[in-house]
Amino acid sequence: MLDQRLVRDNPETIAQQLGRRGKAVDLTKLQLIAQQQRDLEQQRSGLQAEGNRIGKEVGQRIKSGADPKGDEVAELRQQGNAIKQKVAVLEEEEKQLSSELKQQLLGFPNLPSEACPDGRSEDDNVEVRRWGTPRVDDGLYEHWQIAERLQLFDTERSVRIAQSRFVTLMGQGARLERALINFMLDLHTSKGYREVLPPVLVNSASLTGSGQLPKFAEESFRCAEDDLWLTPTAEVPVTSLHRDEIIPADQLPLRYAAYSPCFRREAGSYGRDTRGLIRLHQFNKVELYWFVHPDHSDEAHQRITADAEAVLQALELPYRVLDLCTADLGFSARRTYDLEVWLPGAGAYREISSCSVCGDFQARRSSIRTKEGKATKLVHTLNGSGLAVGRTMAALLENGQQSDGSVLLPKALVPYVGRERLQPE
C-alpha cells in the first residue's frame, strides 16, 4: 500500500511514478480524502490543546483557593466537557475517512523502482544474462507429448474428477513431482532458509496484506461461507506469518522456503497453454520469501534471484534472466527479475520464476515493522519462486528427451527419483 503522506504531500510524484506503469491515474479523490483527514487532524489537535489548557486552568484556580464545586470551576469544566465531545466526533470522522482512504489506496499498485527499466509492454523487458546452452535439435517433442508416451499424467480423467486445466500425476510423474519438491526444499534449507508448510486456505486479511485483494478477487477460488480462499501462492500465508508484528532488527533477515499447492482461476488465459503443465488451476510451487531491513533490500533482491537460479543450474536447465520493465511489473513489486527456462520442444523460453522486491508495500498493508532502539520502521519484503514445480518438470522432460523415447534426468535429481532416466512402463 502506498504511503498516505506521500499521496497527500506529493501527489504529482505519485502520479508520475504510477504513470511509468503505463496507466494514467487520477488521484483527485485520494487527495480530497487526505486533505479532509489532515484538516480534521488539525481541528482535533487544536481542540485537544484548548482542552489541556482548560484542565490546567481548573487546577491552578483550585490551587489558588477557588471552590472546586463553585460556578467558576464548573463553567470551565463544562467547557472542557464540550471540547471532549467535539474531539470524540472528530475522531469518529477521522476514523471513517482513514478507512475510506485505506480502501482507495488498496487499489493502487506499488511504485516502480528508479532502477526499473521503463517500457510499454513485455517486449521492453531487458535481458540481463543467460546460463547454459539451449538445445535446438530438430524433431523434439513438447513436454505433454513426452508425458503421454511415458504415462506421467492423466488429463482426461482429471476433467472427469474436476474440470479442464487440472492434471492427475501418475506413476513416474507423481514420483518426479515429489522428488522435485524435496530437492528444491533441501537445496534452499542447506543455504539457511527455514522451511515452512503453511495453510492452503487463507483469510481475506492475508490476501489483502500480500496484495492479491481487492484487485485479484476474480482470479482466486473462494469458500465464501467461511471467508477463506485457496491460496494462489505461498507468498500469501508467509507474508502474514508476521502480520501485525514488530521484528527486532537483530533477527533480520528472516528467510523462508515454503512449499504449497497453489490455486488460480487463470482468468483471461482462455485458449492459452491448454495442454500439459504450463497453465493449471492447481499446481505445486516452492516459494522463497525474505523479510529484511530497508537498507538491505536491493542486495537481498540479487541474492534471492541467485538462489532461484541455483535450482535451474543444479538441474542443468538453460535459462535467461529478464529485468521486467515498468509495464510488466506485478501489482506488489517495485522491481522484478523473471527467470525463463528453455523449452526445446516448444522452441521458446518460458517463465519459471519471478523474483521481486516489494519495498515496504506489503509490510504497510500487513503492519510488519522492525525496531532499532526506540524507533520503528516498516520492513521490506521479497519473494521468488524457487521454483514452480510443474514447469520445472516440463523443462526436464523437454531438455532430457532421448531418441529412444526415454528422458535422461540430471545427476542431482537421481538420488531423489531413484533412477537415472524415465522410461515407458
From Swiss-Prot:
Family label: Belongs to the class-II aminoacyl-tRNA synthetase family. Type-1 seryl-tRNA synthetase subfamily.
Species assigned in the record: Synechococcus sp. (strain CC9605)
Protein name per the record: Serine--tRNA ligase
Molecular function via GO: ATP binding; serine-tRNA ligase activity
Catalytic activity: tRNA(Ser) + L-serine + ATP = L-seryl-tRNA(Ser) + AMP + diphosphate + H(+); tRNA(Sec) + L-serine + ATP = L-seryl-tRNA(Sec) + AMP + diphosphate + H(+)
SS bond list: none
Lineage: Bacteria, Bacillati, Cyanobacteriota, Cyanophyceae, Synechococcales
Record GO biological process: selenocysteine biosynthetic process; seryl-tRNA aminoacylation
Subunit structure: Homodimer. The tRNA molecule binds across the dimer.
One Pfam entry name: Seryl_tRNA_N
InterPro entries assigned: aa-tRNA-synt_IIb, aa-tRNA-synth_II, aa-tRNA-synth_II/BPL/LPL, Ser-tRNA-ligase_type_1, Ser-tRNA-synth_1_N, SerRS_1_N_sf, SerRS_core, tRNA-bd_arm
Group of enzyme by EC: ligase
